[in-house]
From Swiss-Prot:
Pfam families with a match to the protein in the record: DUF1609, DUF3654
Protein's recorded name: UPF0329 protein ECU02_0080
Covalent S-S links between cysteines: none
UniProt-listed InterPro entries: DUF3654, UPF0329
Region (Disordered), start-end ranges: 321-384
Comp. bias regions, Basic residues: 326-335
Family: Belongs to the UPF0329 family.
Sequence ranges of Acidic residues compositional bias: 350-361
Length: 579
């Protein structure tokens, strides 16, 4: 026999394949005393997110497989929440406690599942809103009488007392002590179910976290949300506990165990903006035991300083607009002073350019024969890289690329049509990214997904979230960089470089460390000569700049004949700050 509650949390996973709770494949957490579970309103399958806090049923309808899996998941969501927050009694001698739970809570949960499924399908609510309703219905904190939890707790106490009276006299002393300890803990567990103040606090904090998650997902652009979720996607405790093979076809929620009184106090003291930042840090992988009063105060200071900077920036822009308006009015009053007004506007424009230049972290660099602007970081600050011929190949015309691939040894590219080559050139001809990868700021943009061995060589993969814009088409995804070390110099050689279009749902797999082991090229020709990235001459019309305001690195392709025409741009997003 064993009892699982606050000291051991047994978390069941919904097996979509069999429509059942897979209790034999569960994860046991050991939270600190006083910590409670906060469930994050994201549903995962394997590495991928299939439901966001903002997801509505109409969104799920776009993917039939997700609708089926989610419906099955909702049929068990109360059991999952119960296991996270309350815990279960496991008595191995017989199933009396299991039968008691089914009798007192099981039928109630079944009715609850039907109600919330109907509410979600027929209504226009979000998943985070649905999760808040599930919490309210499970714990029934607004009821003073006839709470299902309280009645269930009373029955546990009664059953425990009966078991205490009926302990056989022939049971030896060791087993008697063990049973006595179990029954004492069991009685406390039953009593705790009537502690409405505790469950009310859990429900309140869960609502606060759900609201923060929904606001994060609503406020951020798709690429900003992707960089946030990508950063934390490899830090999921539950996925690590189950392992890759056991969880690929299962739906699960993630949670954090922490002192929820601190979150409640922080919300009262600092408000929603600080809670929102705290939840962001949790999504980035912050552990529950690391969240204390000192850390919360630190986050509050960061948020307050950020808000102060934003206010100052808004004031500067407002004053600048007012000065512009005054300048134009003065120009209209003086018919003779038209040229003077133009000169004033020109000076104003120059001032703006200077201010923008002061804000830029690294000034724009025009390459391909153009003079580099002063202030650029010296070559000594940059990392040395080499470029493999298979990467440089994409700089050539589609006809030449096809000819070389057809003669090459890589099966995946041989025999591709010219149209396919033209399409792939858009995603592979991004050598300008190496300008960022060489810089000291590379780690601010790229995540290292780790090293692996394939085809007899050790390789490394870096990824960054990006946005590729071509005409009116905007594509979000990841910039992938594959490298190995040149022998004997040890200099990194970039053999793979591309922009991979992906959405939030598939992003987990793409940034997963195991992804390149399946998708990467089997064999690399390591005997070829590699070109030094620092000596590479970029074509006319390609421009690189770091945009500090949006924390992004941008490559802009312009028409060489008309540089005012932008053909394509790639913006690499900076990684979100970890506090």
């Amino acid at each position: 026999m064993r009892w699982i509650s606050a000291t051991l949390m047994l978390i069941p996973i919904v097996n979509v394949m069999h429509c059942s709770l897979e209790l034999e494949e569960c994860v046991i957490f050991k939270p600190r005393e006083g910590d409670e579970a906060i469930v994050l309103p994201f549903i995962f399958r394997g590495n991928n997110i299939i439901v966001l806090p903002t997801t509505k049923y109409s969104d799920l309808m776009k993917n039939t497989e997700n609708v089926k899996g989610f419906t099955l998941f909702l049929n068990h969501i109360s059991h999952v929440i119960w296991s996270f927050t309350v815990g279960d009694i496991v008595y191995t001698d017989d199933n009396r406690f299991e039968r008691l739970f089914d009798e007192k809570m099981g039928s109630y949960f079944e009715d609850l599942h039907k109600d919330i499924l109907s509410l979600y399908v027929q209504g226009n609510g979000t998943f985070s809103g649905l999760l808040k309703i599930v919490y309210e219905r499970i714990f029934q904190c607004k009821r003073r009488r006839n709470r299902h939890m309280s009645r269930y707790g009373s029955d546990i106490i009664k059953m425990t007392e009966d078991m205490t009276k009926l302990v056989p006299s022939e049971v030896d002393e060791r087993k008697r002590r063990k049973l006595a300890a179990f029954l004492v803990a069991n009685k406390k567990y039953g009593e705790s179910l009537s502690n409405i103040a505790r469950w009310r606090r859990i429900v309140e904090v869960e609502k606060i976290v759900c609201d923060a998650c929904e606001k994060i997902c609503s406020d951020l652009k798709e690429e900003e949300l992707m960089r946030l979720l990508a950063e934390g996607s490899m830090r999921k405790a539950l996925r690590k506990g189950l392992g890759r093979d056991k969880i690929n076809y299962r739906l699960y929620l993630e949670c954090i165990f922490t002192d929820i009184r601190l979150l409640s106090d922080a919300h009262k003291k600092y408000g929603g903006d600080v809670i929102k930042e705290l939840v962001k840090q949790i999504l980035l992988g912050k552990k529950g035991e690391e969240i204390d009063r000192e850390y919360i105060d630190k986050v509050a200071r960061v948020v307050q300083e950020r808000q102060k900077r934003e206010i100052e920036k808004s004031m500067k822009e407002l004053l600048r607009d007012e000065e512009k308006a005054k300048s134009k009015k003065r120009g209209k009053r003086k018919s003779v002073g038209v040229s003077g007004a133009k000169e004033e506007e020109k000076k104003e424009s120059e001032t703006e350019e200077v201010e923008a230049g002061e804000e830029a972290e690294m000034p724009s660099v025009e390459v391909g024969g153009a003079r580099r602007k002063t202030g650029k970081k010296s070559e000594g600050d940059q990392k040395r890289l080499k470029i493999h011929s298979r990467v440089l190949r994409w700089r050539k015309s589609p006809e030449k690329i096809k000819k070389e691939w057809d003669r090459g040894s890589e099966e995946r590219w041989r025999g591709r049509s010219l149209e396919e080559i033209k399409e792939q050139k858009v995603f592979h001809d991004i050598v300008g990214v190496l300008e960022l990868l060489k810089s000291p700021d590379a780690d601010r943009f790229f995540m290292d997904t780790g090293k692996y061995t394939k085809g007899g060589s050790e390789r490394q993969r870096m990824v960054a979230i990006g946005v590729l814009e071509r005409g009116e088409k905007k594509m979000t995804g990841v910039v992938e960089v594959g490298m190995f070390k040149d022998s004997p110099s040890g200099c990194p050689v970039v053999y793979h470089l591309m922009f991979r279009v992906t959405g939030i749902e598939e992003m987990g797999n793409v940034v997963n460390p195991e992804f390149p082991e399946v998708s990467d090229v089997e064999k690399i020709d390591e005997d070829k000569e590699y070109q030094d990235a620092g000596k590479f001459v970029y074509p006319k019309g390609v421009k690189f700049e770091t945009v500090k305001e949006t924390d992004a690195f941008q490559i802009v392709w312009k028409n060489p004949s008309d540089t005012s025409e932008v053909l394509q741009s790639l913006t690499v997003q900076c990684r979100p700050p970890v506090i």
